[in-house]
Amino acid sequence: NKDMTFLIEYAVQNGVIDYVVPESVTSIGSCAFMGCNTLKSIKLPENLKLIEDSTFYYCSKLESINIPNGVTSIGSQAFKDCHNLKSVSISDTVTKIGRSAFSNCSSLTMIKLPESVSLIVVSAFENCSTLSAIIIENPACSFMGDYTIYNFKDQNENYVFNGTIYGYENSTAQTYAEKYNRNFVSLGEYTETLIGDISGNGEIDLYDAIEIAKAIMGMRTFTEEEKLIADFNKDGTVDLYDAIEIARTLLPK
């Protein structure tokens, strides 16, 4: 559209292999990239909020996708028939994986669903023939149906998944795996992470703001896990704003 916030449709005939969506775009229309069979990579903008239905349907040469922070939902059939899709990174702002979102992604071998994902709709990972591992970090994630995750359907119409579901002890992932005879590996007991608690003392205090300030000044280095905890304002970056927000929470009400 005119203000460059809504990408309505991508020119399929354009033949581009790599494409960068403008940073001004906050929404990509349904079917916008459908059938773009030359596209191998696409960089999505940090301000994107929603991936609508069938947005990348049958982008058969697409190899990887990074879902940025801010996106809350992956629409139905969003990446269906992306046969060459090997790598998917989902941000911890996504709450829903839509119906058939990754259906027939035959090159996808592993995917991690962050704790933010609370709903996996029916057929989300149907017929993903090489999928061998799915990590589900939300212990209370909701699943819809026995054919939500499977590799293929056998001659008796059974939905077969030869891979492994990873989840926490006594989680809904474990319940799903046991109900539908899927392999399950426990990630251990679930411990809720307190965002901002860098010191690990169970509360947010001045020490946490100081540790973030040290990292900003190069006096210490955060692990990837610590970066997620330190990103207090959840903008995808650990910076001075996180330390300021923590300090604000400590001010008298």
Regions found by a protein language model. Give the residues of each.
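Structural signature of tandem-repeat unit edges
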Residues: 1-5, 10-27, 36-50, 60-73, ...
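Consensus positions within tandem repeat domains that build extended binding/scaffold surfaces
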Residues: 29-34, 52-57, 75-80, 98-103, ...
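Intrinsic low-complexity repeat tracts in disordered regions, enriched in small/polar residues
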Residues: 37, 58-60, 81-83, 104-106, ...
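A structural signal for leucine-rich repeat
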Residues: 147-152
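A recurrent domain-boundary module in secreted/ectodomain proteins
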Residues: 172-193
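Cellulosome-associated attachment modules in secreted, modular CAZymes
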Residues: 189-253
